[in-house]
């Protein structure tokens, strides 16, 4: 066998038939898949949640808001009425690309038709009003705000509705139930039962009152079916809500030992509805005089007024589902309220009390709610979050309109004069710019971008706070299956509060997460049943093949019904004997396969359904979490035959959160794919099933931190998800229609589409991402090539031929090496540096603004005071650096001068001023310089001035942006990781000749510590190593999907085929001595990534620099050019060694002895002996602090004479002229 070359060149080969793998075509890379389970449906578009939600807001959400706020009348309701009619979006002024370049928001003007009606005359005035520029979503699901891409993260919150909770009484051990009625907007109602059987309620978090007060009060409200209503007349109120009426309502529940309503009535001071209203008012408004009108108005506003109380569509749906659908007394069932009714009805309150009593009585079939169940938590997507903020802006605007209506004369008033758009514009700016859920997009690589758009956060307004969130809400719940990934969540304080949608999950119109399942048919409707339907409500497909039999909307007559029934029955195996009910004749026996003739005979019988052996259809239903709890669901890996029938009689299933083995006759649904449980990031980990969950979590999170490399390389061992993840990430270019490539250059692809239209795709070249990584698109199609809609036509920075490529395939050995890989450190071959295998490009942006100051305008110029020609060599005549210039720390990028404050001029200076005019005015150098530790090449310079029609902030005359590009090779101190949570820091870069090598002379690239595997329990990396070695040697790329990947037997088979040892171990030779190591070593190809934690961003050193103004100690941190903190524990270390002089230096001259440090610096420079240290400044601060508390504190010398701590530092410093240690002159303060 030829030796394995260092650069792995992979081309698809003809697969031997007996290996038993299938080709998986994705993009231009052909993979060989170990999957045994075919996906029932294709993966959905992974960012459709964001796109659909924003589209809903544009079309429906805004209309809802304008209808909700109209009409606006003046305070009297007699003069004017303003209505918002239809609206439309204009065209954006600049496209996304231009907005990014100019640093502005990608938005379109929104215009609304407004109608003003003068009520006294009936006159109508209509006009179109500009309601501000509204940020638009790009086709990738992001917003461009002030030139930066942002994402609005979906929020996972408690759904509006009623929740019942069980609490144990600590003394008696009895189960007592409480309930919370949570609206989308308005007052909460909290019901609870005490141990004396009294049911009380809190209205809007006020004092507790017996629930019968509320029941009596609402009995005086006459509700209409549409939710509107009115109070009963005064004379009737005395008769409503009496004890007898209430006892009658709940008579069927007052059984056994506990009489809840009776006990509550005993505590109730009121006797009828009128008294109850007044009592309720007293409790809710303790200081106000209780009158019947006030009480009625208050209760109506709190519970029955749609402008103040809104259950929302979801709240009403949940309320109906919880209270009315689970009705235990259908014989007296009142009609459930219509789903359009979004206010509370008296019946809802009666039902809640009824359900509480039933729960307290232990009624079978009823139980308290699980608040962490996903049936009780819903997702607020982008559209809804924006709608909520827009509502806030409109309500502020409504207040302004009402005030203006009361001031303006109706005859002269116009819609334009009344409407002030500022509150709406401010609300939207506040939301996109600063809201907790509008986040700066993580753009490190395409996966980070995709995951950010699929994130679900329980934090934010109306959600949880991380300090108060307990363990239960963070934990994995059985209802998360297929909806929220159980693996991918941050480590740290946000663990479990921030999650990611699973691969197949989607959000339904109510905001609940749904996941797809394949329908299992256990019986087939006969022809009579199909005919009874009249019209098909869904497509009908053959249960075995998935072929279309009849389309949705087809009229079903007798002939069509027979055709459908025959097609469905053919090929099925009967579960029971088929007996003709009219003659009693047995037409077919159980276990018999139905052929066409038998099917036609069965169809003629009047039987309604025919029971068949369960068959898994291609029909897919999306189920929400509470719907799923009603069904028995089998996993995707249950073995099926070629006709999609179960091979075994019993299967492992999930039912309402429990796992069980059941007969196949009880199964309702089957998972669509093994990877539907996990998110995209987790589905990219091969052999996930062999990794511990904690390490899989780290692996998922670290893939998002992988820095795009110079030459992306797709993994040899993938999972088949790489193509989909890259396609939907938004960083690659996807063809929008079928066509032929006319031209493909480095910065543009032109495609002639089949309809004759020519479409041009501009590529992004060396653009800076939000995280300073490089985005560079490269065409992967050529002239004359045919492309299909949805094909990837250009790669981005971390994709290779349309597949996600976050790292590099490297040859790894698991062995200790001179302690160089102790504690997860990584030893790396110099080849990775020399051949730029882990080299990445980073682009940083530096900007400077020339502003108007009180002393005059700043100026961008080459004419900078006290700067030599050498420092100006790379600047053009405007004072701006040339593109292509190589720069070092402290080099000038943009020359800028700022006017200095005027001082009293001497006679000579006044003379110079008179002769030369303004030229002699003092200016200071405020140029933009390269920060410490940064070096690179200038790749772009943009100059923006007011004359160029660029929107600059007030007071800014000119802005210059400079882009600086760095090429960073892998170096000691960089963090690297695999996909299994196996992370480490590069400890040393060894020469190629010192690396251990294989028997054929191939040196390994990386040496990892074998001790890092057993305790971490991420065995996936070992299996990846073995399979990677075999696949690379055979020239394949493989896909081993999660939970359905290569088995150990298959890996051994592949190793044998590649003429490699079946245990994956081989004798290695020491590169330094040439001798063989004493035992075989595991060697193979692993996909390793370089993470965004680069040593170059973290390393930092300081000799002198800025000091804190109060304590005079050096500042901390790299950003402030600070020093290293010599803390309490470090002082203990020096004390332990008795290093008194070193300790004194640390606490004085190296820190905050102001005079001492200057004198020490001077002594070092002049080569003189260092003087004794003085008093540290922080000690003086401490004395002042104590004195400020009124304590008399004195400092005494050894002979107990007071020492005067004078501020003589200034005079001492004045003597040391010219020595500046503070960095103050550089403008740090």
Curated annotation (Swiss-Prot):
Transferase is among the record's keywords: yes
InterPro entries: DNA-dir_RNA_pol_bsu_ext_1_sf, DNA-dir_RNA_pol_bsu_external_1, DNA-dir_RNA_pol_su2, DNA-dir_RNAP_su2_dom, DNA-dir_RNAP_su2_hyb_sf, RNA_pol_bsu_bac, RNA_pol_bsu_CS, RNA_pol_bsu_protrusion
Listed GO MF terms: DNA binding; DNA-directed RNA polymerase activity; ribonucleoside binding
E.C. number(s) listed in UniProt: 2.7.7.6
Keyword Nucleus: no
Key words of the record: DNA-directed RNA polymerase, Nucleotidyltransferase, Transcription, Transferase
Catalyses which reaction(s): RNA(n) + a ribonucleoside 5'-triphosphate = RNA(n+1) + diphosphate
Pfam families in alphabetical order: RNA_pol_Rpb2_1, RNA_pol_Rpb2_2, RNA_pol_Rpb2_3, RNA_pol_Rpb2_45, RNA_pol_Rpb2_6, RNA_pol_Rpb2_7
Highest taxon of source: Bacteria
GO BP terms in the entry: DNA-templated transcription
Annotated GO CC locations: DNA-directed RNA polymerase complex
Subunit structure: The RNAP catalytic core consists of 2 alpha, 1 beta, 1 beta' and 1 omega subunit. When a sigma factor is associated with the core the holoenzyme is formed, which can initiate transcription.
NCBIfam families the UniProt entry points to: PRK00405.1
PANTHER family hit by this protein: DNA-DIRECTED RNA POLYMERASE I SUBUNIT 2 (PTHR20856)
Its biological purpose: DNA-dependent RNA polymerase catalyzes the transcription of DNA into RNA using the four ribonucleoside triphosphates as substrates.
Family: Belongs to the RNA polymerase beta chain family.
Name of this chain's protein: DNA-directed RNA polymerase subunit beta
Organism: Roseiflexus sp. (strain RS-1)
